[in-house]
């Protein structure tokens, strides 16, 4: 799991940065799991915490080349593949109760991060549900 959830991020990021020109952006999608640390998924949490540690250092390394690096950490977000215990109708219910995010919520954060002036660095956005989820 670390190979997929951490090592792949690092390898892809380093290769992308090598090919990029100034004025580019790298946007990582991490997870609130890095900070919420719920039991039962310690390896996944370790991977996401690794990304959370990697991104600020990587941002500093690439800043002089005018490559911005940001991290979005979504909370509980609806997805068919991730939560088999929450079928689509239950996810719609939780979204309606403000207890689950939609992918569009993360896209809004990404758009905000990527459309800021080059002089600014929105380096971390945490997107959480307004109310606690089950």
Regions found by a protein language model. Give the residues of each.
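A short helix-coil junction within the Rossmann-fold of NAD(P)-dependent oxidoreductases
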Residues: 15-23
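Active-site loop immediately N-terminal to the catalytic Tyr-X3-Lys motif
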Residues: 23, 36-42, 98
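C-terminal helical subdomain
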Residues: 71-72, 90-134
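Alpha-helical segment proximal to the catalytic Tyr-Lys
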Residues: 18, 60-63
């Amino acid at each position: 799991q670390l190979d997929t959830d951490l090592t792949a991020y690092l390898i892809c990021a380093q290769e992308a940065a090598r090919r990029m020109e100034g004025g580019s952006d790298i946007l990582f999608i991490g997870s609130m799991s890095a900070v919420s640390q719920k039991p039962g998924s310690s390896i996944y949490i370790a991977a996401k915490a690794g990304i959370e540690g990697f991104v600020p250092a990587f941002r500093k390394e690439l800043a002089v080349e005018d490559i911005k690096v940001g991290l979005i950490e979504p909370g509980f977000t609806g997805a068919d593949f991730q939560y088999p215990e929450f079928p689509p109708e239950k996810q719609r219910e939780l979204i309606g109760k403000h207890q689950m995010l939609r992918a569009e919520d993360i896209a809004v954060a990404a758009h905000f991060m990527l459309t800021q002036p080059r002089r600014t660095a929105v380096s971390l956005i945490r997107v959480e549900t307004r109310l606690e989820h089950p």
